[in-house]
Amino acid sequence: MDFNKIGDENVVFQIFKLEMLIMSEFPSFIEEKDKLLCLNVLANLLGGIFENEDKIIPNYKEAVIAALFERLLLSSNQKSTSKSNQMIKLLNNSLAHNNGLPSQRCNHDSKLVYMSLVQNNGLPGQRSNYVCCPLCMEQHCIELLTYQLFAKWRNFPRIDFSPVLQGNRGPRFFYTCFLCNSTFLASA
């Protein structure tokens, strides 16, 4: 596994192969769009790619996802080894009882738990990240608070993702919809 390879011409294809590899291990009852959403968030956040994917034994999904999260925690929270260890323990416990998906420990939909963990330094959060996409009208959008982590893997415009104050409507943020890829402003 090589999580550090950056700038490869075939990185998009390799991420696609990574997604297909993990998707093949998801339980059949998980909806296809939810699988894709989870995996797109995961791959884009980490930029993780596999070399020698043919050597990965089937049914290693739990180890693969745990390794990806471990890499994420180490890169985004290097000063807190204890939190990384705590998160790995949480993953190990939840993966065994939740079809390979991290336990949410809150009211988040499972397809949003990945970004939730990132926004809360590797710990499940209580804050909902749902907003409604104005184009496809689905509540599956995620606040772009970690732009630097996945900008290189998607063609997002280089815009300021800090809160935007607009009159008495309160702080507003740029969001992206991971199903139709639209980017828009919405209240937190």
UniProtKB/Swiss-Prot annotation:
Purpose: Has a role in meiosis.
The keyword Nucleus belongs to this UniProt entry's keyword annotation: yes
Annotated localization: Cytoplasm; Nucleus
Name of the featured protein: Meiotically up-regulated gene 94 protein
Native source organism of the sequence: Schizosaccharomyces pombe (strain 972 / ATCC 24843)
Cellular component aspect of the GO annotation: cytoplasm; cytosol; nucleus
Residue pairs linked by disulfide bridges in the UniProt entry: none
Nucleus keyword on record: yes
GO biological process: meiotic cell cycle
Gene encoding the protein: mug94
Keywords, ordered alphabetically: Cytoplasm, Meiosis, Nucleus
